[in-house]
């Protein structure tokens, strides 16, 4: 598991992880079982930033610093995905044209709106989490990377070749359930029985959005995995903020 976790961190972050990178796509696929734990470590660094920046400058600036650190650690990997996905999905063009738009490195109007919206919502929801923000900041990236596995395992890839197809074809059912168990333990350990509600919201939203993406694109792509991850992270923060606002958490 340590080997898989190290490979997952190399793939998902810019952190300097000791050791040699994977020499094959299959080795990278095997690391997917550790994606949720990689998300937990990402969340730990983000939560530490929140603690430090909040102590120095208050919750507003602390929450903003946490969001910026979050994006920096991952090199905007999933943020790029939600921007590209928005440009393609809301172009209302043919399926082939949407896939072409998704490959374009330039960001369009809908992509910019989606990117700004997700960052702004995350920031506001972190503020709304109050003293429990650090817990939410750990759980959110954990479930976000778990949602990537849902997209890869349960939904078809849009392209016949590429890394997405390799991930889909070589992911085992046991990998999915192991990753699910890890994500569940982290969420339950930090948010107690409310983790069940958060899981339910994230799963339902992921299934609805992923099915829409499949109908629109013929399958999922690397960019749509990123979009699903970002949306899931935002939903975790949103649910925790709502529970705190109504004084039930």
Curated annotation (Swiss-Prot):
The keyword Cell membrane applies. Its cofactor is Mg(2+). One of its GO terms (molecular function) is cobalamin 5'-phosphate synthase activity. The keyword Chloroplast does not apply. Its main location: membrane. GO terms for biological process: cobalamin biosynthetic process. InterPro entries: CobS. It is a multi-pass membrane protein. Keywords: Cell membrane, Cobalamin biosynthesis, Magnesium, Membrane, Transferase, Transmembrane, Transmembrane helix. It is found in: Cell membrane. It is an enzyme of class 2 (transferase). Its EC number is 2.7.8.26. One of its GO terms (cellular component) is plasma membrane. Pathway: Cofactor biosynthesis; adenosylcobalamin biosynthesis; adenosylcobalamin from cob(II)yrinate a,c-diamide: step 7/7. The chain crosses the membrane at residues 32-52, 53-73, 107-127, 136-156, 190-210, 224-244. It catalyses: alpha-ribazole + adenosylcob(III)inamide-GDP = adenosylcob(III)alamin + GMP + H(+); alpha-ribazole 5'-phosphate + adenosylcob(III)inamide-GDP = adenosylcob(III)alamin 5'-phosphate + GMP + H(+). Belongs to the CobS family. Joins adenosylcobinamide-GDP and alpha-ribazole to generate adenosylcobalamin (Ado-cobalamin). Also synthesizes adenosylcobalamin 5'-phosphate from adenosylcobinamide-GDP and alpha-ribazole 5'-phosphate. This is Adenosylcobinamide-GDP ribazoletransferase. It comes from Herpetosiphon aurantiacus (strain ATCC 23779 / DSM 785 / 114-95).
């Amino acid at each position: 598991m340590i080997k898989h976790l190290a490979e997952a961190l190399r793939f998902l972050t810019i952190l300097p992880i000791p050791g040699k990178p994977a020499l094959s796509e299959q080795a990278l696929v095997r690391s997917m079982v550790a994606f949720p734990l990689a998300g937990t470590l990402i969340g730990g660094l983000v939560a530490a930033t929140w603690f430090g920046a909040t102590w120095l400058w208050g919750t507003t600036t602390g929450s903003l610093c946490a969001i910026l650190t979050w994006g920096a650690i991952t090199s905007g990997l999933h943020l790029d995905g939600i921007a590209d996905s928005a440009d393609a999905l809301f172009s209302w063009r043919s399926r082939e044209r949407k896939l072409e738009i998704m490959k374009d490195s330039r960001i369009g109007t809908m992509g910019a709106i989606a990117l700004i919206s997700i960052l702004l919502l995350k920031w506001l929801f972190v503020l709304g989490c109050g003293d429990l923000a650090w817990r939410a900041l750990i759980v959110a990236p954990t479930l976000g990377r778990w949602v990537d596995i849902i997209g890869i395992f349960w939904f078809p890839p849009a392209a016949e070749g590429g890394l997405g197809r390799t991930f889909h074809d070589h992911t085992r059912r046991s990998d999915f359930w192991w990753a699910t168990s890890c994500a569940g333990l982290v969420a339950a350990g930090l948010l107690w029985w409310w983790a069940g509600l958060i899981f339910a919201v994230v799963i339902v939203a992921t299934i609805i959005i992923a099915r829409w993406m499949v109908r629109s694109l013929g399958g999922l792509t690397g960019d749509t995995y990123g979009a699903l991850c970002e949306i899931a992270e935002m939903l975790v923060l949103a649910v925790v903020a709502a529970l705190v606002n109504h004084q039930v958490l």
